[in-house]
Regions:
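Extracellular beta-solenoid/beta-roll
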Residues: 201, 208, 213-218, 223-347, ...
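Beta-strand-rich solenoid/repeat architectures in extracellular/passenger domains
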Residues: 1-16, 27-42, 61-77, 89-104, ...
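Glycine-rich beta-solenoid repeat tracts in large extracellular/virion proteins
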Residues: 1-5, 17-24, 44-55, 78-85, ...
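Outer membrane beta-barrel translocator domains of Type V secretion systems
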Residues: 425-437
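Short low-polarity hydrophobic stretches
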Residues: 108-110, 282, 349, 437
Length: 437
């Protein structure tokens, strides 16, 4: 179909033909329940083609598709939704299912194109709420913005899965990807990133919360290379599994609110920045040594350095703000040497945070004698740290004593673990009562 209107339609093509294509400044309107699939290479299910012409240099192709569309492609280089029209627009309403099988076949893509009629820019794609995007081939991204001025918008509760190597959930090279609340991204292949910008001209904006799952060691959950990735709408819940990386002046800025969970590490290179804001019982489970530009921790939120791989994890924070946060460390007080570390270059004046410990020394009994284990360096000396009772899930609660270095003959910029008190909890009392009876 090249121009016109359809209702409740089935379209199948092969051998390089597109199922639905609007060329130049044509408009296509299709009702609910469309099923469109292609089998050949470079065959798109929905395609807004070159929109610049000598008679209408600014008009773009327009395609509007109703609810519940099922779009699929099987060949290489075949996208379910392809925008290549100057000032064009594609709207896919809610509940669409988009699937690609071939290599280099994206779910939703906006590409720049240059021809004798001029260059293409400013295309827009809107994907409705509750839609799903799945790609299986290598180099096949869920959503790919590669057109100057393009805006690819995802409504709430869109799901994206990619299986192939180097297949990113979101990739912004030129243009903007906007994602509504409840976005769910899962990437499985080697070298695949959940949300990725790889040029200064690209950006990704989370307009609400998101779930991003990437456990691959050579891929990142969130990766900003030159561009920007932001999620600062507030009151949003993020669940992120995988690492974050900012390189070449790229920036990641996330407000993680309302029981958000981040399981992974962070890394910076070449003036990259990562700013994390943990509020209202949010949780960062640090899986290896990490560095962030700024970290806000408040409202009972926790930064847990005590991962299963062992101790001596170091988290470096250029600017720490907030108050009432919790930092949990793996420690071995008896050794006075082994333990995780928090290094802060600047902290908020008058702030207070709490310290929990998972101490190896307690496995074999009590820690006796005068001990001190360096945990925290605050180069600004603005923040205070207080040990807090922690329910370890066993027979005892644990209270660590944390003291500033100048009370121990050390630097006032440093904080030390000096004592661990074991206190009977309800479980201990129940067992003792049982023996007494």
């Amino acid at each position: 179909l090249y121009n016109g209107e359809l209702e409740d339609s089935n379209v199948d093509t092969s051998d390089g033909a597109h199922a639905v294509r609007a060329n130049f400044h044509a408009t296509i309107n299709i009702g609910d329940g469309l099923t469109a699939g292609t089998l050949g290479e470079s065959s798109h299910a929905v395609y807004a083609a070159q929109g610049r012409s000598t008679t209408n240099p600014t008009g773009g192709s327009k395609i509007n598709i109703g609810k519940g569309a099922v779009l699929s492609t099987a060949g290489d280089g075949s996208h379910t939704v392809m925008m290549a029209s100057n000032n064009g627009k594609i709207v896919i309403e809610e509940g669409a299912e988009m699937t690609t099988l071939g290599d280099g076949s994206h779910g939703v893509a906006a590409y720049a194109d240059t021809s004798a009629k001029g260059s293409v820019a400013n295309g827009a794609v809107e994907i409705g709420a509750g839609s799903t995007i799945a790609t299986a081939g290598g180099g096949s991204h869920g959503v790919f913005a590669n057109m100057t001025g393009s805006v690819l918008s995802l409504d709430d509760n869109v799901g994206i899965t990619t299986e192939g190597d180097a297949s990113h959930g979101l990739l912004a090279q030129r243009g903007v990807i906007e994602a509504g609340d409840g976005l769910n991204i899962s990437v499985e292949g080697s070298g695949s990133h959940g949300a990725y910008v790889n040029a200064a001209t690209g950006s990704i904006e989370f307009l609400g919360g998101a779930t991003i799952d990437n456990n691959d060691n050579d891929g990142y959950a969130i990766y900003a290379d030159k561009g920007t990735i932001t999620g600062t709408a507030g009151n949003s819940t993020f669940n992120i599994t995988g690492n974050m990386y900012a390189d070449n002046s790229g920036s990641i800025d996330l407000d993680m609110d309302n029981n958000s969970v981040f399981t992974g590490s962070t890394a910076l290179a070449n003036s990259g920045t990562i700013n994390l804001n943990l509020k209202n019982n949010s949780y960062w489970h640090v899986t290896s040594s990490s560095e962030v530009s700024s970290l806000h921790v408040s409202g009972g939120s926790m930064v847990n350095l005590s991962h299963e791989a062992g101790m001596n994890t170091v988290v470096t924070v250029d600017d720490l703000s907030g108050s009432g946060g919790v930092f949990k460390f793996n420690t071995e007080l008896d050794s006075e040497a082994n333990g995780d570390k928090l290094v802060i270059n600047s902290s908020e004046t008058g702030s207070t945070h709490y310290v929990h410990v998972n101490d190896l020394s307690l496995i074999n009994g009590e820690v006796s004698g005068e001990k001190k284990l360096h945990l925290i360096t605050d180069n600004s000396s603005n923040a205070s740290f207080v040990g807090e009772y922690m329910d370890t899930g066993g027979l005892w609660d644990v209270l660590p004593t944390v003291e500033r270095g100048d009370t121990l003959g050390e630097s006032a910029n440093e904080w030390y673990l000096t004592k661990i008190e074991k206190k009977e909890n309800g479980n201990t009392e129940t067992i003792n009562d049982g023996f007494a009876s």
